[in-house]
Amino acid sequence: MSVPAEAGKRRDRRRHVLDLDDFSTQEIEEILETAVSMKEVLGRAIKQVPTLRGKTIVNMFFEESTRTRISFELAGKALSANVVNFTARGSSVEKGESLIDTVRTLQALGADMLVMRHSESGAPYLAAQYFHGSVINAGDGRHAHPTQALLDLFTVRQRLGRIEGLKVVIVGDILHSRVARSNLWGFTRMGASVTLCAPQTLIGPESFWKATWPDLTITSNLDECIKDADVIMTLRLQKERMEAGLLPSLREYSRFFAITAERVARAAPHCLVMHPGPMNEGVEIMPDVATSAQSVIEEQVANGVAVRMALLYRLSGE
């Protein structure tokens, strides 16, 4: 069994996926179309094709991860690649080996692709300078998480049939969120209008955002901006990246910015509720909303495998 023929109409000429800032609308469209084919593969009785047989993918996760790491592992194995999971703990990194030397070592061992998550913004970019194969950014510091944005785009298009013209509201810890930044690139590139909603302390200077996205709406009034929204994406409070004093209390934050059933009722009837995970239920989203008919949180997780299969496939040049 093989990948459906329509998935192979075009290969990406790019070697790396570091963020969506330099992706054209056409490139994103083609990835989403390929993901449709990969989702069809995952719906078969045997969820595997031989497309990347003989290729070696190393998942380098320097930060803890459940969804992204397992999703990439499943994606690589569904394409018949050899998948190796690397963690800093127990490796030569603990002995002081640099990222560059680690990348060179993995290259010497025959790795064809590196999937990297790192706490330092820019780490995958550094790796890409020294690795002869492909590097995929699986999240770097506050900077970017391009595959999360692609799976979010895919989920919205699968549910609503389009992205162009939609009103997307991103709520929560914008300041520390790599997901917010990559989704800004993705949704605006695909023609959606985006609103950022957060306390001033969790969004930073408006001029920073407007310099890149001049049409962006920025507000701290969730009850107002959520009206007629097609998509509500709420983000986790990233306490591990926060400085002290950014929030008075979690209770105060939840009062003004939690996604509740009452607030969702203000949005469009077909509005989708999204969360990249992991969730702090009762803080940024109420449990009944997370499991409601409008929630696509589990679909996001499931769609991540198909989208990451599409990226691995297109970058491989097979």
UniProtKB/Swiss-Prot annotation:
Catalysed transformations (reactions): carbamoyl phosphate + L-aspartate = N-carbamoyl-L-aspartate + phosphate + H(+)
Domain of life: Bacteria
Family, similarity comment: Belongs to the aspartate/ornithine carbamoyltransferase superfamily. ATCase family.
The name this protein goes by in its record: Aspartate carbamoyltransferase catalytic subunit
A single GO molecular function term of this UniProt record: aspartate carbamoyltransferase activity
InterPro entries in UniProt: Asp/Orn_carbamoyltranf_P-bd (IPR006132), Asp/Orn_carbamoylTrfase (IPR006130), Asp/Orn_carbamoylTrfase_sf (IPR036901), Asp_carbamoyltransf (IPR002082), Asp_carbamoyltransf_Asp/Orn-bd (IPR006131)
Keywords: Pyrimidine biosynthesis, Transferase
Taxonomic path: Bacteria, Bacillati, Chloroflexota, Chloroflexia, Chloroflexales
Alphabetical list of NCBIfam families matching this protein: asp_carb_tr, PRK00856.1
Sequence positions that bind carbamoyl phosphate: R67, T68, R117, H145, Q148, G277, P278
UniProt enzyme class: transferase
E.C. numbers: 2.1.3.2
Pfam family, one: OTCace_N
Function comment: Catalyzes the condensation of carbamoyl phosphate and aspartate to form carbamoyl aspartate and inorganic phosphate, the committed step in the de novo pyrimidine nucleotide biosynthesis pathway.
GO cellular component, one term: cytosol
One of the protein's GO biological processes: amino acid metabolic process
Known partners and oligomeric status: Heterododecamer (2C3:3R2) of six catalytic PyrB chains organized as two trimers (C3), and six regulatory PyrI chains organized as three dimers (R2).
Protein's gene: pyrB
Source organism: Roseiflexus sp. (strain RS-1)
Residues binding L-aspartate, per UniProt: K95, R178, R236
Pathway(s) annotated for this protein in UniProt: Pyrimidine metabolism; UMP biosynthesis via de novo pathway; (S)-dihydroorotate from bicarbonate: step 2/3
